[in-house]
Curated annotation (Swiss-Prot):
Gene (name only): glmM
Protein name per its UniProtKB record: Phosphoglucosamine mutase
SUPFAM superfamilies recorded: Phosphoglucomutase, C-terminal domain, Phosphoglucomutase, first 3 domains
Residue numbers binding Mg(2+): 99, 239, 241, 243
Catalytic residues (positions): 99 (phosphoserine intermediate)
Sequence positions bearing Phosphoserine: 99
InterPro entries per record: A-D-PHexomutase_a/b/a-I, A-D-PHexomutase_a/b/a-I/II/III, A-D-PHexomutase_a/b/a-II, A-D-PHexomutase_a/b/a-III, A-D-PHexomutase_C, A-D-PHexomutase_C_sf, A-D-PHexomutase_CS, Alpha-D-phosphohexomutase_SF
Entry keyword Signal: no
Natural source organism: Finegoldia magna (strain ATCC 29328 / DSM 20472 / WAL 2508)
Cross-referenced Pfam families: PGM_PMM_I, PGM_PMM_II, PGM_PMM_III, PGM_PMM_IV
PTMs per UniProt: Activated by phosphorylation.
GO cellular component: cytosol
């Protein structure tokens, strides 16, 4: 990670960490790196946060001052921006969103002209120019100044594209949706109504401050309760910017990203459509998923945590399905990033075609309990633990004890002064005890350094 860019763009408290001055400088820096492109067009979308308008105005000022035109897409999911960047042949796309974070946070994320996240090397070059604006030796005046256009067809274009990616009729199927007061609030209900589902919707009346508040993909109990109350056949919950999906079966049981990937993997394998006989997950992927797919001869390729790393592995080796437990699920033949609505209609399509209830698909794997605790350490010590013999000995003892029925994963947080401790196994109470012991040991050893 750099000075400004994290693993998913630039993010922080709007007006404090992420200021209009930074947004303006970022826009100019990125445009300067793109100054030689033929099509000087940039598309911008945003979620429902109150600070979105403020940051959008700053970005547009910077972009147009560099001679680039802007298509304003309005409130629209992140994956829609990735798709529409390609559709409009734009030189890049910008999303203003902080995903699942509270409303006071916001973020700015760029997509390349192909709809992929920017390479680390390009982000580093942009960061340099943010801090060295005097090196942007480009002055635009007169008719060369950029223009701004309201792209009113953007939402319908994206809706029609998603509908074209499935062969699905949900007549007679009850579907519940939790839109988390976010970017899917208008689009998701339209899509499921177009698919003839009997739709029950909650959390769509956004006000700029209620995004993700006690709802959405990080609060799955909401969709579970809605499915039970409405007696729905399936439920889908999205995060603020619409790139995550958490599903729910007809009994109210949650299907996280691992369970969804498991269901998709089984279906593709059974229908001889799973390229390279593997799916892509991360080091946090539940052992239950690995065991379930192994039984049918499917491998799980693991990357470091982050959907960008999952995508890199998929592109590099030709895998077509991958994702994270958190609900980032990538169907690379359909879009270049995680797409919550796409994942939902794909899962519904599999249920209809296989004539299965979601509960049957959910039961294809049994999740091993996972305990996650955070050891608080100073940032300068976040990587020192790797060389500590006492910590490594404790980890080795636990891993030997678990063998193939559990594991220990230690990783430093990319954004906070924390070391995350995850232990996975069969006994929840035992795992909690061992996780706290290891957390305390890490904190103690880091204090001694």
């Amino acid at each position: 990670m750099g000075k400004y860019f994290g693993t998913d763009g630039i993010r922080g408290v709007a007006g404090e960490d992420l200021t209009v001055e930074l947004a303006y400088k970022l826009a100019r820096a990125a445009c300067y790196k793109l100054k030689d492109v033929d099509n000087k067009l940039i598309v911008i979308g945003k979620d429902t946060r109150i600070s979105g308008d403020m940051l959008e105005a700053a970005l547009i000022s910077g972009i147009t001052s560099m001679g680039f035109d802007v298509y304003r897409l309005g409130v629209i999911p992140t994956p829609a921006v990735a798709y529409l960047t390609r559709f409009y042949n734009a030189c890049c796309g910008i999303v203003i969103s902080a995903s699942h974070n509270p409303y006071e946070f916001n973020g700015i994320k760029y997509f390349s002209n192909e709809g992929f996240k920017l390479k680390d090397s390009l982000e580093e070059e942009i960061e340099y120019l943010i801090d060295h604006q005097d090196e942007i030796d480009l002055k635009v005046t007169g008719e060369k100044v950029g223009r701004v256009y309201e792209e009113e067809c953007a939402r319908d274009t994206y809706i029609n594209y998603l509908l074209s990616r499935v062969d699905l009729d949900l007549t007679g199927v009850k579907v519940s949706l939790d839109c988390g007061y976010g970017a899917t609030s208008e689009i998701a209900p339209i899509i499921f109504n177009r698919l003839n589902a009997d739709v029950t919707v909650t959390n769509t009346e956004y006000d700029g401050k209620n995004i993700n508040f006690k709802c959405g993909s990080t609060n799955p109990e909401v969709i579970s309760n809605l499915v039970k109350i409405s007696e729905s056949d399936m439920g889908f919950s999205f995060d603020g910017d619409g790139d995550r999906l958490i599903a729910c079966d007809e009994t109210g049981e949650i299907m996280d990203g691992d369970h969804v990937i498991c269901a998709v993997g089984h279906f593709l394998k059974e229908n001889n459509k799973l390229k390279n006989n593997a799916v892509v997950g991360t080091v946090m992927t539940n052992i239950g998923l690995i065991k379930s797919l192994k039984e049918i001869g499917v491998d799980v390729i693991k990357t470091q945590v982050g959907d960008r790393y999952v995508l890199e592995e998929m592109r590099k080796n030709g895998y077509i399905i991958g994702g994270e437990q958190s609900g980032h699920i990538i169907f690379i033949e359909d879009n270049t990033t995680g797409d919550g609505i796409l994942s939902a209609i794909k899962l519904a399509e599999i249920a209809v075609k296989s004539k299965q209830k979601l509960s049957e698909m959910n039961n294809l794997m049994t999740s091993f309990p996972q305990v996650l605790v955070n050891a608080k350490v100073n940032n300068e010590y976040k990587k020192v633990y790797k060389d500590d013999e006492v910590i490594n000995q404790k980890i080795a003892e636990l891993e030997h004890e678990f063998k193939d029925e559990g594991r220990v994963l230690i990783r430093p947080s990319g954004t906070e002064p924390l070391i995350r401790v995850m232990i996975e196994g069969e006994n929840q109470e035992y795992l909690e005890k061992k996780a706290i012991e290891l957390k305390d040991l890490i904190e103690e050893r880091c204090e001694l350094i």
